[in-house]
């Protein structure tokens, strides 16, 4: 499981999404200089999206023995992360004058990049495994023909 780069990339991506549960989304500066932090989990749509992304990342890690399925799950998770990033960007442009946003808003973009790279690596692993199986089968056929 821990021998493939795909697993590490997906794990880092999943940890980035998981860290968003503990980070603040934005801060609102009050009239007397007091700040109110808004966490990601306080907004229900963000919470649902992060749970879906966390589930996708964990499922991708656990499907390490099936590289084609892992590639599909990584690609789907990456696309969901891009959608989440667009959603965060829309909120940023809507509330940029009222709130001070956290740098953690860029985590989905970084995680999406890692997921896309992991998807590509999983496809390469799958094709390599298929080629290895095919070459072993052809080697067995060739050795039986020479006898």
Feature locations, PLM:
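Alpha-helical membrane-associated segments of multi-pass integral membrane proteins
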Residues: 99-126
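Interfacial helix-start motif at the membrane-water boundary
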Residues: 37-55
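Hydrophobic alpha-helical membrane segments
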Residues: 73-90
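Cytosolic juxtamembrane helix and N-cap/initiation of the first transmembrane helix
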Residues: 1-20
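Juxtamembrane helix-break-helix junctions at the cytosolic face
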Residues: 58-71
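Cytosolic juxtamembrane helix at the C-terminal end of the final transmembrane segment
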Residues: 118-142
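Hydrophobic transmembrane helix segments
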Residues: 15-43
């Amino acid at each position: 499981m821990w021998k493939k780069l795909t697993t590490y990339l997906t794990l880092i991506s999943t940890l980035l999404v998981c860290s968003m549960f503990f980070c603040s989304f934005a801060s609102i500066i009050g009239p007397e200089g007091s700040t109110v932090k808004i966490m990601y989990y306080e907004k229900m749509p963000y919470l649902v999206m992060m749970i879906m992304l966390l589930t996708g990342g964990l499922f991708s890690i656990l499907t390490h023995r099936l590289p084609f399925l892992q590639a599909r799950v990584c690609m789907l998770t990456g696309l969901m992360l891009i959608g989440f990033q667009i959603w965060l960007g829309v909120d940023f442009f809507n509330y940029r004058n009222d709130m001070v946003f956290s740098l953690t808003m860029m985590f989905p973009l970084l995680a999406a990049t890692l997921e896309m790279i992991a998807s590509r690596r999983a496809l390469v692993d799958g094709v390599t495994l298929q080629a290895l199986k095919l070459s072993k089968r052809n080697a067995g056929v060739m050795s039986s023909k020479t006898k």
